[in-house]
Amino acid sequence: MTDIFANPDKTLDALGLRCPEPVMMVRKTVRHMEDGQTLLIIADDPATTRDIPGFCRFMDHQLLAQDTGQTPYRYLVKKGAKAE
């Protein structure tokens, strides 16, 4: 079985940061990425379980996967790829 989180183009460590910092860092990082690239976000703020999916919907990025069963949470976002 392949781990979807294994080979992102970029990784963002947001451990220890609290709202709104993780989403602000995601936005800044995604700005410097090419369409189609993937970003692995690692966070432990419970607000990210709401904020990261909301950011993806609002900014037309695709949330490929999320693992929020325990901390640290992991999210895999694909830039500029609106969910179908």
Swiss-Prot record:
Active site: 19
Entry keyword set: Cytoplasm, tRNA processing
Pathway participation: tRNA modification
Keyword Cytoplasm appears in the UniProt entry: yes
GO biological process entries: tRNA wobble position uridine thiolation
Subcellular location: Cytoplasm
GO MF annotation list: sulfur carrier activity
GO CC terms, sorted: cytoplasm
Principal cellular location given in the protein's record: cytoplasm
Signal peptide range in chain numbering: none
Domain of life: Bacteria
Gene3D superfamilies registered for this protein in UniProt: TusA-like domain
InterPro entries: Sulphur_carrier_TusA, TusA-like, TusA-like_sf
Purpose of the protein: Sulfur carrier protein involved in sulfur trafficking in the cell. Part of a sulfur-relay system required for 2-thiolation during synthesis of 2-thiouridine of the modified wobble base 5-methylaminomethyl-2-thiouridine (mnm(5)s(2)U) in tRNA. Interacts with IscS and stimulates its cysteine desulfurase activity. Accepts an activated sulfur from IscS, which is then transferred to TusD, and thus determines the direction of sulfur flow from IscS to 2-thiouridine formation. Also appears to be involved in sulfur transfer for the biosynthesis of molybdopterin.
Oligomeric and partner information: Interacts with IscS.
Family, similarity comment: Belongs to the sulfur carrier protein TusA family.
PANTHER family named in the record: SULFUR CARRIER PROTEIN TUSA, SULFUR CARRIER PROTEIN YEDF-RELATED
NCBIfam families, per the entry: PRK00299.1
UniProt name for this protein: Sulfur carrier protein TusA
Species, as recorded: Yersinia enterocolitica serotype O:8 / biotype 1B (strain NCTC 13174 / 8081)
